[in-house]
Amino acid sequence: MVELELSDGLAVVTIDRPQARNAIAPETMDQLEKALDAAEGARALVIRGAGDKAFVSGGDLKQLSAIRTLEAAEAMAWRMRGICDRLADFPAPVIAAMNGHAFGGGAEVAVAADIRVAADDIKIAFNQVALAIMPAWGGAERLGALVGRSRALLLAGSGTVLDAAEAERVGLVDRVLPRASFEEGWLALARSLANAPAGEIKRVLSGVAPAEAVNAFARLWVSDEHWAAADNVLSRPR
């Protein structure tokens, strides 16, 4: 249901429920938590859905239909909010590889990532209003940070469906790739981030004291990786 692949510092988490359009069920939450535990220490993480129809289609209504009390609804929302927070706070860069549509809660999972890469034929919508509910997994706040408060209210309040190009234009998606080269594209990006000090850059961008940023730079400066790269540059003919 949730698969984790670890290779050369890259963790790829795949929600593998294509028959349910990769919807989030209680067992999916269990396995996502375990996958994130196991991915600790990765230098980059990708979250994606199986197949090419859906990234994540939101909560699995069939399996969540038993939730009928206020307490149970709050518990479910807090749990998924916690999972999305773990994605957002992961110490290395997180990429949402949007291989298919992302609706409702799926859009919330996408905006929990640092970078969203989308196939050119996908659609994304914060369309919880169609079910007379609202984003509750932290997606409303993250949407506002990405596109601005007014546009976030417009998108989530109306449930507007955006295609990949529109999503990129408003800042909701960072890179759009042709469907034919999508898999190779997100994998190349993820590997480049895993092989760079992107985790330190993410930490500085998250807001640290100047002394911490300088210390992070200095640690990289004295690393073997830096001097191997520097020696390679210095040895080139001029």
Predicted segments, located by residue:
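Terminal low-complexity tails and localization/encapsulation signals of metabolic enzymes
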Residues: 230-238
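C-terminal long alpha-helix characteristic of the crotonase
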Residues: 117-122, 173-215, 224
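Glycine- (often His-adjacent) and acidic-residue-rich active-site loop
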Residues: 41, 49-83, 102
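CoA-thioester-processing core
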Residues: 83, 87-89, 97, 103-156, ...
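Well-ordered beta-strand positions
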Residues: 115, 154, 158-160, 166, ...
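Residue-level detector of structured alpha->beta connecting loops
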Residues: 40-43, 91, 114
